[in-house]
């Protein structure tokens, strides 16, 4: 069936390429219906006229066999129409999404196995992607709890430290919420707030290292959300400065610059034409707030590191999305500070709705959930295609939050789709953070996590692998959802991939054409694998 089988030479962006199981079922049923109609069409003039909606001129002239065939054809078509109607209106998020997720994981595992066999560095990239994005952890031998000079007390896990900001303006609110003697330069930089590729590093430099405060202050004003939700400017400013103070400036990547970048990226994605007027003001506010708090109080190590070292956080959150749960707890806890409740004028219903959405969005930033999120998004995109809805119709919470979760996840993984100078800075920062974790693991006698060993990691190869297996499939699917709005981002991503590929030591000649990206969501599983899955 053409809906289920794809040629290796097929175009990566082919319109008719359908790979998620649920969308394949719909396409297959449509083909069956079309075939039945065509077969019945040839049964005779009476059948043909009936199928076309016009009665035969003389039903008495029809032979009994033809009458029987006509009745069977009509009943079959009615059954198929009913099935299609049911399937098209089915909420596909859960079990159907799981089907696609499991399929994608099997496909990616095959690709990663091949990659790991190519070289030692290839094996490390493969292990990193598998452990980080596939929710698969190797068996580890847990050490005794390490002795630390300053172990985290339970009190700190639940939230507030003493106020970290040195001063709060009591009179006039600064134009961008931050005290700076470079306000004009900052204003010029923030003119790009609505554009993809804002130099958030420059914003950090010009705002006294308060990029998160400056960016959110600007974004909320740009969207007129302070007025919509009656958020007092002084309350917003106090909360933002407190929130930003709970990001660790000594953490190379997961600091307030990253948070500001994710907020601004999400702001741009929310403004894409395909999503115009799709989301309510409350949903937009929830998305911006989720991005703002999504990495607050990040210690610069991974969830698995916290689990392996028996940390208090892992204990509190039962090893499940440890950091993401902590970011949420801190972000909401800070609202309880003096004059920090930016949601004070929302109704109880609005507060509960916003909280639910923020929790769902931040928990979805756990990278181990990536494949499930991608599978859900891909299924949604393909289902919309095969049901010919044409426009993005999100008429239930499950669909709406799914797109918002994907949007925040895309913003969180937007570095490779940014202009190369920005992408390179982010790469340097994430590798510095990884290597710092690796050093801690080495000192503690732990196995060093993939990509965290500064002596063996290949930075360039890791970025090519990250784009091929994670970023490109995600951004390609997002681009399908908002087509054609994100084509420029996809082009940038592919150009950046080529730049890093050209710098891989002893790299082979560039692959061209459809094989350029090693992992494509168009791979077909063999019958043997399908049978093996059924046995398990």
UniProtKB/Swiss-Prot annotation:
| Subcellular location as annotated | Cell projection, Cilium
Q: Where are the transmembrane segments?
A: none
Give binding positions for Zn(2+) 2: 295
Give the start-end ranges of region Disordered. 49-69
Q: Which cofactor does it need?
A: Zn(2+); Mg(2+); Mn(2+)
Binding residues annotated for AMP, in chain numbering? 254, 258, 295, 412, 463, 466
Q: Write out the entry's keywords from A to Z.
A: cAMP, Cell projection, Cilium, Hydrolase, Magnesium, Manganese, Metal-binding, Phosphoprotein, Zinc
- Phosphoserine occurs at 507
As one GO molecular function, the record gives: 3',5'-cyclic-GMP phosphodiesterase activity
- Its pathway? Purine metabolism; 3',5'-cyclic AMP degradation; AMP from 3',5'-cyclic AMP: step 1/1
Ranges for domain PDEase come to 178-507
Where, by residue number, does Mg(2+) bind?
Answer: 295
User: Which Enzyme Commission numbers does its entry carry?
Assistant: 3.1.4.53
Q: Where does 3',5'-cyclic AMP bind?
A: 254, 463, 466
Q: Give the first-level EC class, as a single word.
A: hydrolase
Pfam families, from UniProt? PDE4_UCR (PF18100), PDEase_I (PF00233)
Organism domain of life: Eukaryota
Covalent S-S links between cysteines: none
InterPro entries in UniProt? HD/PDEase_dom, PDE4_UCR, PDEase, PDEase_catalytic_dom, PDEase_catalytic_dom_sf, PDEase_CS
Q: For this protein, what does the record note about how its cofactor is bound?
A: Binds 2 divalent metal cations per subunit. Site 1 may preferentially bind zinc ions.
The record's comment on protein family reads: Belongs to the cyclic nucleotide phosphodiesterase family. PDE4 subfamily.
User: Its biological function?
Assistant: Hydrolyzes the second messenger cAMP, which is a key regulator of many important physiological processes.
- What this protein is called in its record is 3',5'-cyclic-AMP phosphodiesterase 4C
Q: State the organism of origin.
A: Rattus norvegicus (Rat)
Classification of source organism: Eukaryota, Metazoa, Chordata, Craniata, Vertebrata
